[in-house]
Swiss-Prot record:
Residues carrying lipid (S-palmitoyl cysteine): C539, C546, C549
Chain ranges passing through the membrane: 515-535
InterPro entries named among the record's database cross-references: Capsid_hemagglutn, Hemagglutn_HA1_a/b_dom_sf, Hemagglutn_influenz_A, Hemagglutn_influenz_A/B
Subunit structure comment from the entry: Homotrimer of disulfide-linked HA1-HA2.
GO biological process: clathrin-dependent endocytosis of virus by host cell; fusion of virus membrane with host endosome membrane; fusion of virus membrane with host plasma membrane; virion attachment to host cell
Residue(s) at site: Cleavage: R329, G330
Similarity comment: family membership: Belongs to the influenza viruses hemagglutinin family.
Keyword flag Disulfide bond: yes
MF terms in GO: host cell surface receptor binding
Gene, per the UniProt record: HA
Protein's organism: Influenza A virus (strain A/Duck/Hokkaido/7/1982 H3N8)
Function as written in the Swiss-Prot or TrEMBL entry: Binds to sialic acid-containing receptors on the cell surface, bringing about the attachment of the virus particle to the cell. This attachment induces virion internalization either through clathrin-dependent endocytosis or through clathrin- and caveolin-independent pathway. Plays a major role in the determination of host range restriction and virulence. Class I viral fusion protein. Responsible for penetration of the virus into the cell cytoplasm by mediating the fusion of the membrane of the endocytosed virus particle with the endosomal membrane.
Protein name, as recorded: Hemagglutinin
Topological domains annotated Extracellular: 1-514
Length: 550
């Protein structure tokens, strides 16, 4: 007798998900190494090697630092009244005027950089009884001696240097930045030759602040033929406030003010060339794409940039758990469902069906469950980017040698932040990967349960992701199962009849040895019971005598 399962009265339907021969290893909360069909790299580890000039306005400092451009060094006159989003300082920048220092260099540089402009307004300061527009051979403007264009070097007039007391109110509705300085002669002779008094003094005040500087006379290392120095200071005058300058010598006076603006402009040291291209994120190494949430190119950034982390790679799962086929089976060489392994031949969807019936074999993707999984995964990368991208910039931190402890503390804080973000990145990606794998597994289980509920008693779960259908199920029937229109009542009687026939045949053929052994055991038991009963009967009648001795 032929098995009903081997003729046209049954069919096999398997459910599965796609797989690839070589997947990608990702990390989850529960597993450091789990293979998925697809993953996206989250760490940007290289730059373009050039700084893009769009959408940010990049100002190339060339051979000028920002402070030299601010003061008006003769070789930096081209930067007068310039504006920028990012001022790029080059390693070959140099000063070519009177040697100077800025006691609070980092603060002034940061203040001017964030303002994003060198717009300068000249004001009519009145300096009575002194000689203005001093110059030096150390600061050539053309063939003649010159000086910083934004500063006015005041020296004695004749043999006198009167006490200067000048006020300048701020009647505008914006902050004004005044740059001024104090000259430190190299000798007492130079001091009296320039300012008459043996010791000068400069006091600059507003209602909110006051600075008093006394020159330090003494020789310093020679720079551009000078052993004297100028110290540069700065004062911000708020609207309605008044600038007061008082001095009896050594004053390097302002010629006007810089108009301060609030913004997100900045300055960066870089030797990367500036090119015509588009990039939101800039590092000293060059521009980098910001389509990833993390980067390990450089800690210093400008613009909307990925978060800096220590890791070289972090992969976000964008596909399901990968279970490659264990061997080449052919389409139905050894039919198996998702519980055993994935299907490497399925390219038109993530989930699908394979069937074998009287009309042959076939395969089709389930687009609904595939789309449901893809929709949930697609937004993951954008959400991670939104959580991590810097909306502003991470500026360079600079401190003088005196502020070494502050610098050490700042470095410790920055390193701690990087460690924290690197750890957060690991956890965030592991959580997202765990969620991706769980949801793709869930969609597979949902599809399997949906199919089980349709087939009911008309089919049997084979335990490997497949169903044995106990009725004739042609391609139209298979399609109705896939699209959810299958009516199990139509096939119920046929399925029950075939199931009983198949189970009966399986019982006769598959369990014959078991039945024989069970029958033999029962026969032996009955024989022993009859023999024991006969002995007891005979003992009662006296035909058999049994003596028990102790």
């Amino acid at each position: 007798q032929d098995l009903p399962g081997n003729d046209n009265s049954t069919a096999t339907l398997c459910l599965g998900h796609h797989a690839v021969p070589n997947g990608t290893i990702v990390k989850t909360i529960t597993d450091d190494q789990i293979e998925v069909t697809n993953a996206t790299e989250l760490v940007q580890s290289s730059s373009t090697g050039k700084i893009c000039n769009n959408p940010h306005r990049i100002l190339d400092g060339r051979d000028c630092t920002l402070i030299d451009a601010l003061l008006g060094d003769p070789h930096c006159d081209v930067f007068q009244d310039e504006t920028w989003d990012l001022f790029v300082e080059r390693s070959n920048a140099f000063s070519n005027c009177y040697p100077y220092d800025v006691p609070d260099y980092a603060s002034l540089r940061s203040l001017v950089a964030s303002s994003g402009t060198l717009e300068f307004i000249t004001e009519g300061f009145t300096w009575t009884g002194v000689t203005q527009n001093g110059g030096s051979n150390a600061c050539k403007r053309g063939p003649a001696s010159g000086f910083f264009s934004r500063l006015n070097w005041l020296t004695k007039s004749g043999s006198t240097y009167p006490v200067l007391n000048v006020t300048m109110p701020n009647n505008d509705n914006f902050d004004k930045l005044y740059i001024w300085g104090v000259h430190h002669p190299s000798t007492n002779q130079e001091q009296t030759n320039l300012y008459v008094q043996a010791s000068g003094r400069v006091t600059v005040s507003t209602r909110r602040s006051q600075q008093t500087i006394i020159p330090n006379i003494g020789s310093r290392p020679w720079v551009r033929g000078q052993s004297s120095r100028i110290s540069i200071y700065w004062t911000i005058v708020k609207p309605g406030d008044v600038l007061v300058i008082n001095s009896n010598g050594n004053l390097i006076a302002p010629r006007g003010y810089f108009k301060m603006r609030t913004g997100k402009s900045s300055v960066m040291r870089s030797d990367a060339p500036i090119d015509t291209c588009v990039s939101e994120c800039i590092t000293p190494n060059g521009s980098i794409p910001n389509d990833k949430p993390f980067q390990n190119v450089n800690k210093i950034t400008y613009g909307a940039c990925p978060k800096y982390v220590k890791q070289n790679t972090l992969k976000l799962a964008t596909g399901m758990r990968n279970v490659p086929e264990k061997q080449t089976r052919g389409l139905f060489g050894a039919i198996a469902g998702f519980i055993e392994n994935g299907w490497e031949g399925m390219i038109d969807g993530w989930y699908g069906f394979r069937h074998q019936n009287s009309e042959g074999t076939g395969q089709a993707a389930d687009l609904k469950s595939t789309q449901a999984a893809i929709d949930q995964i697609n937004g993951k990368l954008n959400r991670v980017i939104e959580k991590t991208n810097e909306k502003f910039h991470q500026i360079e931190k600079e401190f003088s040698e005196v502020e070494g402890r502050i610098q050490d503390l700042e470095k410790y804080v920055e390193d701690t932040k990087i460690d924290l973000w690197s750890y957060n990145a690991d956890v965030l990606v592991a959580l997202e990967n765990q969620h991706t794998i769980d949801l793709t597994d869930s969609e597979m289980n949902k599809l399997f349960e949906k199919t089980r509920r349709q087939l009911r008693e008309n089919a049997e779960d084979m335990g490997n992701g497949c169903f044995k259908i106990y009725h004739k199920c042609d391609n139209a029937c298979i399609e109705s199962i896939r699209n959810g229109t299958y009516d199990h009542d139509i096939y119920r009687d046929e399925a029950l009849n075939n199931r009983f026939q198949i189970k009966g045949v399986e019982l006769k053929s598959g369990y014959k040895d078991w039945i024989l052994w069970i029958s033999f055991a029962i026969s032996c038991f009955l024989l022993c019971a009859v023999l024991l009963g006969f002995i007891m009967w005979a003992c009662q009648r006296g035909n058999i005598r049994c003596n028990i001795c102790i």
